[in-house]
C-alpha cells in the first residue's frame, strides 16, 4: 500500500488544489462583493492603472525575495465582483454537466462551491489574493526556487486542517524569524509558514525563510525595473512581471517572409495584466527594451499593420488587429487591447460549445472503436 505521509510535493499539491477550487469559489460571490480600501467595489470600475492588488494587501516589494525573477498575481476579489465572468463559468459548467454522467458534475458555480466545502471542509470564498513567484535563469523559470503567498480569511487551524486532511500524521512545527513553519515529518524540503493572520506562504524551506526575512525587513525584496513594471500594470483579475532571459526572444522567432521584428531581442523585462472596465475586458503587455523602446514600438506597429493586410486575414480579425494600441513611455513599450464585455461572453460561450462538441465526438469515437 502506498504511504500517505506528507512530503513537500504533497503539501504543494494540496496548496495548488486549494487554490484551484478557491478560484472557482470566488466567482460565486458568496461573500457578497467585497470593496476596496476606498469603498469602491473592485473589478467593476474603470481601472486606475495604479497597479494590481490595490484592493488587497500583497505588495511584492515587501514580500517577494530579490532572487525571484517572475511574479504572477491573482486578485480573487476582482473575480468575486465580476458577474459577467461568473455567467461564463456557469454556462461552461452547465454544458459540461450535460456531457458528464452520474450527476456528479456541478451544474453551476454555487453547486461547485458546495461540493468543494463538503470535500475539503474549507470555505473557498475565503481566498482573497494569491501571489506566485519564482526564480528565472537563462534556461527559463526555476521551479526549485518558487513559492506562493496567499491572503485569506482562513484561520491557521482551518488551513492546517485542510492540509492534513489527506495525511496519516500531523505536520511538524518549527520557528524561523518569529514565524511558525509547518512541514512534513522528518523532512527538510519545505512546507508552509504563517506570516500573519490569514497570510501564508508555501514553498521550499529556502524560499519560506527568504520570504520571512523580507517580511521582517531583514532581506531584500524585488526592486528595479521588475518591481516598477509590476506596479505599473493596470488593476485587474491577473497581473505578471518577469525578467526575460538572454536569447529567450530572438528576431528569428518573430520573423516570417512578410514580417520581421528586429528589436525583440532588446526586451529585458515584460509585464502585463487582464482587467475589466465598465464596458470591456482588456489585456495589456509592457516590454522594457531600454533605448530600443521606440524602435520596438515601430516594429510592432509595422508587424500589426502587415498582419492586418494579409490576404488570409479575415475582415473581423483585421479590425481587431487595428484596435490594438501601441504606446511608448520612456524605455517601455506597451501593447493593449479591449473588447466589449458582451462580445467576450459570446466568444466564450461559442468556445465552450465547440469544446463540448469535440468531447462528444471523441467520446463517440472511443465508444465505437474496437481492437
Named regions from a protein language model:
Residues 1-371:
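Terminal disorder- and signal-encoded targeting elements
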Amino acid at each position: 500500500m502506498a504511504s500517505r505521509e506528507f512530503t513537500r510535493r504533497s503539501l504543494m499539491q494540496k496548496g495548488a488544489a486549494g487554490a484551484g477550487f478557491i478560484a472557482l469559489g470566488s466567482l460565486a460571490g458568496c461573500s457578497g462583493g467585497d470593496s476596496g480600501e476606498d469603498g469602491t467595489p473592485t473589478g467593476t470600475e474603470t481601472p486606475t492603472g495604479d497597479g494590481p492588488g490595490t484592493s488587497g494587501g500583497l505588495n511584492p516589494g515587501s514580500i517577494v525575495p530579490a532572487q525571484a525573477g517572475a511574479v504572477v498575481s491573482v486578485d480573487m476579489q476582482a473575480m468575486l465582483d465580476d458577474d459577467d465572468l461568473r455567467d461564463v463559468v456557469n454556462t461552461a459548467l452547465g454544458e459540461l454537466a450535460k456531457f458528464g454522467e452520474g450527476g456528479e458534475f456541478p451544474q453551476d458555480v454555487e453547486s461547485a462551491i458546495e461540493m468543494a466545502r463538503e470535500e475539503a471542509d474549507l470555505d473557498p470564498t475565503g481566498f482573497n489574493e494569491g501571489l506566485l513567484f519564482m526564480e528565472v535563469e537563462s534556461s527559463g523559470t526555476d521551479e526549485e526556487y518558487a513559492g506562493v503567498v496567499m491572503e485569506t480569511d482562513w484561520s491557521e487551524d482551518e488551513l492546517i486542517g485542510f492540509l492534513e486532511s489527506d495525511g496519516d500524521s500531523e505536520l511538524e512545527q518549527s520557528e524561523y524569524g518569529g514565524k511558525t513553519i509547518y512541514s512534513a515529518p522528518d523532512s527538510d524540503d519545505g512546507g508552509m509558514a504563517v506570516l500573519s493572520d490569514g497570510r501564508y506562504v508555501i514553498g521550499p524551506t529556502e524560499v519560506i525563510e527568504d520570504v520571512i526575512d523580507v517580511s521582517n525587513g531583514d532581506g531584500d525584496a524585488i526592486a528595479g525595473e521588475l518591481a516598477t513594471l509590476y506596479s505599473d500594470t493596470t488593476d485587474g483579475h491577473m497581473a505578471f512581471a518577469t525578467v526575460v532571459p538572454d536569447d529567450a526572444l530572438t528576431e528569428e522567432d518573430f520573423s516570417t517572409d512578410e514580417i520581421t521584428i528586429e528589436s525583440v531581442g532588446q526586451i529585458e523585462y515584460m509585464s502585463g495584466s487582464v482587467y475589466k472596465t465598465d464596458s470591456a475586458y482588456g489585456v495589456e503587455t509592457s516590454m522594457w527594451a531600454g533605448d530600443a523602446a521606440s524602435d520596438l514600438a515601430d516594429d510592432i506597429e509595422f508587424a500589426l499593420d502587415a498582419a492586418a493586410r494579409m490576404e488570409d486575414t479575415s475582415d473581423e480579425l483585421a479590425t481587431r488587429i487595428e484596435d490594438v494600441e501601441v504606446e511608448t513611455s520612456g524605455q517601455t513599450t506597451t501593447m493593449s487591447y479591449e473588447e466589449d464585455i458582451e462580445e467576450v461572453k459570446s466568444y466564450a460561450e461559442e468556445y465552450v460549445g465547440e469544446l463540448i462538441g469535440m468531447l462528444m465526438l471523441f467520446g463517440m469515437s472511443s465508444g465505437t472503436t474496437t481492437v
